[in-house]
Amino acid sequence: MPIVEDRLFRKIKKLTGKAIGDFNLIEEGDRIAVAVSGGKDSWTLLHILDSLRRRAPIRYELIAVNVDPGFPGYRTDIMEAHLREYGFANRMERTDCATIIKEKLRPGSSFCAFCARLRRGVLYSVATELGCNKLALGHHLDDFVETLLLNQFYVGTLAAMSPKLLADNGQHTVIRPMVYVEESDVAAFAEANGLPAIPCGCPEETRSDQNRQRMKRLVSQLAEDIPHLRSSLIGALGNVQPRHLLDASLKDFGTAAAD
């Protein structure tokens, strides 16, 4: 069925377009691999980018790329059917990540982090093979905010995600066009359009990333009393004032007049 182009659709599309403009995420001639996992975030990103592409003043291509990690029960057939229905160019990459994780994961290491690194490596390889210069990921505003808090609480760094950065391999630019879109809007869009929610089959899914879940609950609780909390936190990432921080690499503390 066609995507419902209602008020919510227009809101997400406008915010995504704003991020693309603010951070120069998409340029003329880009060939973009859109990572599609089968979750609400990646489906929403794919459909919104496609809608923007149809009316954009520049030309760019989208290719949906899925990395099947090899967990039992991961229904890639449902995903393929959805991609065919909407005419998306796609690449379904089947891997043996599940076996590699089982054999190589060190005691005490994060299952989710190791799996993510493996899948990201596959995405880069597939993007190279497809001639894509950019990789689009479905992280939304809440992901940025939660990562900001995680780094402060557990790592001791003032950092979140970047909406645009050069990948470690030096060949691809990673973009996150939904940086301004709240998770609640993504969830509502996915539900309104019946986008298929496809569990990855991960055996650790119920125990995955408890710290992030803790941050998610914290933000939700605080937002009950501070409705603009999320927008304030995402705004803070673009309003850094080094003179009020403690990082000596950003400020010279050697003079008596340091302020």
Curated annotation (Swiss-Prot):
Cofactor: Mg(2+); [4Fe-4S] cluster
GO MF, one annotated term: 4 iron, 4 sulfur cluster binding
EC number in record: 2.8.1.-
Record keyword Manganese present: no
Motif PP-loop motif location, chain numbering: 37-42
Principal cellular location given in the protein's record: cytoplasm
Reactions the enzyme catalyzes: cytidine(32) in tRNA + S-sulfanyl-L-cysteinyl-[cysteine desulfurase] + AH2 + ATP = 2-thiocytidine(32) in tRNA + L-cysteinyl-[cysteine desulfurase] + A + AMP + diphosphate + H(+)
SUPFAM superfamilies according to UniProt: Adenine nucleotide alpha hydrolases-like
Note describing how the cofactor binds: Binds 1 [4Fe-4S] cluster per subunit. The cluster is chelated by three Cys residues, the fourth Fe has a free coordination site that may bind a sulfur atom transferred from the persulfide of IscS.
Family the entry assigns: Belongs to the TtcA family.
HAMAP family: TtcA
Assembly notes: Homodimer.
Protein name: tRNA-cytidine(32) 2-sulfurtransferase
